[in-house]
Amino acid sequence: MPRNNDIKKVLVIGSGPIVIGQAAEFDYAGTQACRSLKEEGIEVCLVNSNPATIMTDKQIADQVYIEPLTLESLKEIIIKEKPDSILPTLGGQAGLNLGMELAECGFLDEQGVKLIGTTAETIFKAEDRQAFKDTMEKIGEPIAASQVVKNIEDGIAFTNKIGYPVVLRPAFTLGGSGGGIAHDEQELIDILSNGLRLSRVGEVLVERCIAGWKEIEYEVMRDANGNCITVCNMENIDPVGVHTGDSIVVAPSQTLGDKEYQMLRTSALNIINELQITGGCNVQYALNPDSFEYCVIEVNPRVSRSSALASKATGYPIAKVTAKIALGYHLDEIKNAITQKTYASFEPMLDYCVVKIPRLPFDKFLTAKRTLTTQMKATGEVMSICNNFEGALMKAIRSLEQHVDSLMSYDFTGLTDDELEKQLAVVDDRRIWVIAEALRRGVKYEHIHEITKIDLWFIDKIAILVEMENRLKTEELTVDLLKEAKRIEFPDNVISQLTDIDEADIKKMRYDNGIVAAYKMVDTCAAEFEAETPYYYSVFGSENEAAETNPQKKVLVLGSGPIRIGQGVEFDYCSVHCTWSFAKEGWETIIVNNNPETVSTDFDIADKLYFEPLTAEDVESIVNIEKPDGAVVQFGGQTAIKLTEALMKMGVKILGTKAEDVDAAEDRELFDEILQKTGIPRAAGGTVFTAEEAKKVANEIGYPVLVRPSYVLGGQGMKIAWNDDEIEEFIGIINTITQDHPILVDKYLMGKEIEVDAICDGTDILIPGIMEHIERTGVHSGDSISVYPAHTISEKAKETLVEYTKRLAQALHVVGMINIQFIDMDDNIYVIEVNPRSSRTVPYISKVTGIPIVDLAARIIMGETIKGMGYTPGLAPTADYIAIKMPVFSFEKLRGAEISLGPEMKSTGECLGIDKTFNGALYKAFEGAGVELPKYKQMIMTVKDADKPEAVGVAKRFEKLGYKIYATRSTAKYLQEHGVNALRVNKISQESPNVMDLILGHKIDLVIDTPTQGNGDKTRDGFLIRRNAIETGVYCITAMDTANALAHALETASDKKTPVDIATVKNL
């Protein structure tokens, strides 16, 4: 059936800020779908509050709204734009829930707008726990014994009937939010009360725990005609009980017999037909490893994290096809974009193995619980492809960029046999390393399987890797042994460690004997048809399929790897824009990246895509085959920057700013020389390697000092130290990972923090806009609320900023991007740090100023000038509206993590508020970040002594807004003495009713708690207050500047005269 011609204008709902459970995969899906709709001549409107995405670029849709994803703002956009249809299945859980709410409240019928791609009834049947249960029972699909409960008493009664442990799954939530496994009544009460609060409809499913069964997923497609195909089936290495987003996943499944595979495939198609789903859908199963018994765990009636993985694993563009099906096309009418010969009704075939490993944030949150359950904790993931499972696992491990490159990287040799056995039972992110250690000690496969419930097939494969370690350690390195080690992807540096042979000699031995990587293509059809836009993966001991092309010029663009705190989707945005710019100028583009969730790894972004780890050895193999004319490293974050030196050694030209100038910005002594030459002041400080040296520097310049390693992103390992003991502690933590570069110790200055992104052509600079942070220095720039245009700095300070930016860019010979952070102390400007590369603020500042910085920087790298491109050098004219970028955190998913803000970054995402007034923009930014206020108008204040004078002003503003203020002893006394009617409440250690009772009583909206120094202690009152506030869903602020900003925003909300102004990116 050709497409439905009644559909002319579609509103696509994006997924909002990146949080744990909802990452870059929706930017990828949304971008692909918008492009797919525009191909069909549809007018596309898009709403998304996340400015870091490609989907919010003006060329992706006809109208782009960066507005909070709330019912109110969507209604306004629908009234203004009058779309005939809404596509809600590409915006993750956020998009689905909004589509549902718009349909339920009758607004869509009123406006004559219909949901396409799915119906409200389908969403309800799949997402509502009771409706889903009834539907499965109706078609005879087995589910675990369960009951939907709306209160705690019913939950306890049902659990007593079926016995512990039980799994709790809230309805309509994302990434397992609020869910978990309860082993006893206390755990049940804790998890259930949280789950009922987080569910949109106040429902939680309590079900029999089938942890230990295999977890299998099927990604299926269906059109309106009832044609169905399975795109891919996947198997979690971890058994049921770990969220699939936190599991190691392999595609296609490796341990299913044909009977099991066909049984689950039939079931998946049965379910998708009953639910009448049109488009992509994901079905998760639990399979009893000892029989043919299975249960349906859940169905996602939308594009999901798993569908991004399935798309990249097979080359089948699920989001693109879903968008076409939503327009009425059938599968056999949609061409396969990779082969251009087959159709979307053709099931993909894989002649390789794909492994996905989650990227978990425990390197950022040293106090957080490492255990993995049904509530997701990963911020991102990596994917690798190989022709054998062991090789794919080894490649995925080194793609994580967590200082791991083999199964020896986490060291469990110090454990006794009993301790090791206990560790095997712990489900955390290091489990395969523990299994490897058990195998080294001769523990039997069956015994490991009994404890971990991981299939024997996977244990056997880990044993093959352990056996190879042993052979490399004990045997002579022959050509045959080296061939076999490379076949299962042992990197040269690991072979070198095990054999005690120099890495350079191993490489020479490989080259002399022709042991080099060959590249195979992903073509969806196991090489049955010719592929037009393939992508490649490396294997050893096979024929090379990467086509020899000799165009005029080739550029290698290094991607940014997995999404993690500190290096998010912003850098993918920069990589993609850079690639598009080079392609426009006739260069052949080559991307290397390993993140399945991103736009950069889509099959049609670059001319060639290599799905490989971003390490020197892996990149060198590609360079040897492609021989690029140059490489661009300034857009891939720290990942790409770290490979600069290796690329130069390979003889690859670095395009843009030269490597030695990048080093000069990171190297303390060289940078100090540049500052002296250019006459720019900075904080006093020095470089050290040991705690003794650090204490000496700190005492010379005076406490407090900022301690940080060099060459890091997102303030990794950065701390503010107030005394000698803290220096000892912090240097100890930094030095747990061997440092190749010195540690920096600087005087900590208090002032306004200002950030500038600029481009330089070697002579002139262009600054699109100056951004000012609401939080004072000491809070990482990625965690601060950022305001454009800067609104409290003087003209004189602005002139100084522009002048200093120009001097620094010229002294560092910048060609392309530069990012500088300054401090403004009473019009005296100091430089904090300089990064001659793109930064996380680039997408945001590009959008709000309308200056496409990445494109301009790429053109400069190719030889154009700022004037030649038609721009006036210096600071661009400022806008007549305010744009505020608000950080978004995922603390509630990370039990035990310290939430107070400091110099190490903790936010996972961001959203944007745009308005004519400062307060209006602030209100939208808080709304976009999901801050729901006020409900009860009751708050708790407990602030450190230094903040008390400022707390009085804040408290008075909240009092005026009608808030009842509770405060702990000394804060209450101080507030009362200064005319605030604060109610004193006991500390946690004192008798009830105390602070904890108030928080756990669910009657508090807001906690303002500014921590004292030495915030590492988990038993202190402050830590417990902050943690419990977050875990019961209370908004918690840890800096006075943020509290002031929130008061501003709420004053706007209460003053209803200001209409919400809806602006599109086009008009900015």
Curated annotation (Swiss-Prot):
Sequence positions that bind Mg(2+) 4: E833, N835
Residues engaged in binding ATP 2: R708, K747, L749, E753, G778, V779, H780, S781, Q821, E833
Region (Oligomerization domain): 402-546
InterPro entries the UniProt entry points to: ATP-grasp (IPR011761), ATP_grasp_subdomain_1 (IPR013815), CarbamoylP_synth_lsu (IPR006275), CarbamoylP_synth_lsu_oligo (IPR005480), CarbamoylP_synth_lsu_oligo_sf (IPR036897), CbamoylP_synth_lsu-like_ATP-bd (IPR005479), CbamoylP_synth_lsu_CPSase_dom (IPR005483), MGS-like_dom (IPR011607)
Keywords for the protein's UniProt record, in alphabetical order: Amino-acid biosynthesis, Arginine biosynthesis, ATP-binding, Ligase, Magnesium, Manganese, Metal-binding, Nucleotide-binding, Pyrimidine biosynthesis, Repeat
Main EC class the enzyme belongs to: ligase
Gene3D superfamilies noted in UniProt: 3.40.50.20, ATP-grasp fold, A domain (3.30.1490.20), ATP-grasp fold, B domain (3.30.470.20), Carbamoyl-phosphate synthetase, large subunit oligomerisation domain (1.10.1030.10), Methylglyoxal synthase-like domain (3.40.50.1380)
Renumbered residue ranges of the record's region Carbamoyl phosphate synthetic domain: 547-930
Binding site for ATP 1: R129, R169, G175, G176, R208, I210, E215, G241, V242, H243, Q284, E298
Biological process, per Gene Ontology: 'de novo' UMP biosynthetic process; glutamine metabolic process; L-arginine biosynthetic process
Pathway field: Amino-acid biosynthesis; L-arginine biosynthesis; carbamoyl phosphate from bicarbonate: step 1/1; Pyrimidine metabolism; UMP biosynthesis via de novo pathway; (S)-dihydroorotate from bicarbonate: step 1/3
GO cellular component labels: cytoplasm
Residues given in the record as Mn(2+) 1 binding sites: Q284, E298
Binding-site residues, Mg(2+) 2: E298, N300
Domain ATP-grasp intervals: 133-327, 672-862
Reaction catalyzed: hydrogencarbonate + L-glutamine + 2 ATP + H2O = carbamoyl phosphate + L-glutamate + 2 ADP + phosphate + 2 H(+)
Family label: Belongs to the CarB family.
Domain notes: The large subunit is composed of 2 ATP-grasp domains that are involved in binding the 2 ATP molecules needed for carbamoyl phosphate synthesis. The N-terminal ATP-grasp domain (referred to as the carboxyphosphate synthetic component) catalyzes the ATP-dependent phosphorylation of hydrogencarbonate to carboxyphosphate and the subsequent nucleophilic attack by ammonia to form a carbamate intermediate.
Full protein name: Carbamoyl phosphate synthase large chain
Source organism of this protein record: Agathobacter rectalis (strain ATCC 33656 / DSM 3377 / JCM 17463 / KCTC 5835 / VPI 0990)
Organism phylogeny: Bacteria, Bacillati, Bacillota, Clostridia, Lachnospirales
Encoding gene (name): carB
